[in-house]
């Protein structure tokens, strides 16, 4: 069984300052994200051992750990890729056109996304819904509650308190504003184009 590994940040730890501090990125990436990677690997090891021994007393817990930690790892990886020190612009091209078509305007999309970010106890996600071939915003609690089956994350914003409390205290709204100062649409645009090509 291959092990999951923590990918390096695609920029330096201080690259998103003053919007997200070096300290927060260090803690968030090296401790929190690493913890989800470790948890996923541990859960997979438990499942493999249980399949070999036939003793499934710990299987239910391990299955839950796969979902929680695996989703945490995947979403954190998308979160890092959704930002860059050169970010802060609005989307362009095919993704901008689809946002305008599905939400009415970029401003409408952003307002709805910010509402998801204020409501979620986990993540605000822009996803591609392969059932309706549309973009949707979803508010996800933890890492895996509230997700839509058949949807593909395009843009990820982590709104767990560990993402912002050190920098912004309880003012989550200021953190969401800061995210838009560093949001980078290159990777999300590529993910959207791949999903649209596959399902449309």
From Swiss-Prot:
Please name the InterPro entries in this protein's record: Fe/Mn_Superoxide_Dismutase (IPR050265), Mn/Fe_SOD (IPR001189), Mn/Fe_SOD_BS (IPR019833), Mn/Fe_SOD_C (IPR019832), Mn/Fe_SOD_N (IPR019831), Mn/Fe_SOD_N_sf (IPR036324), SOD_C_sf (IPR036314), Superox_dis_Halo (IPR054865)
Q: Which cysteines are joined by disulfide bonds?
A: none
GO molecular function terms listed in the Swiss-Prot or TrEMBL record: metal ion binding; superoxide dismutase activity
Q: Where is the signal peptide?
A: none
According to the UniProt entry, how is activity regulated?
Answer: Inhibited by hydrogen peroxide. Is resistant to cyanide and azide inhibition.
The EC number(s) this enzyme carries = 1.15.1.1
- Which ranges of the sequence are coiled-coil? none
Which keywords are on file for this protein?
Manganese, Metal-binding, Oxidoreductase
Cellular component terms, GO, for this chain's entry? cytoplasm
Could you tell me what reaction this enzyme catalyses?
A: 2 superoxide + 2 H(+) = H2O2 + O2
Q: Per the UniProt record, which residue ranges are transmembrane?
A: none
Known role: Destroys superoxide anion radicals which are normally produced within the cells and which are toxic to biological systems.
Q: Which family does it belong to?
A: Belongs to the iron/manganese superoxide dismutase family.
Q: What is this protein called?
A: Superoxide dismutase [Mn] 1
What's the source species for this entry?
A: Halobacterium salinarum (strain ATCC 700922 / JCM 11081 / NRC-1)
**Which lineage do the record's taxonomy fields give for this organism?**
Archaea, Methanobacteriati, Methanobacteriota, Stenosarchaea group, Halobacteria
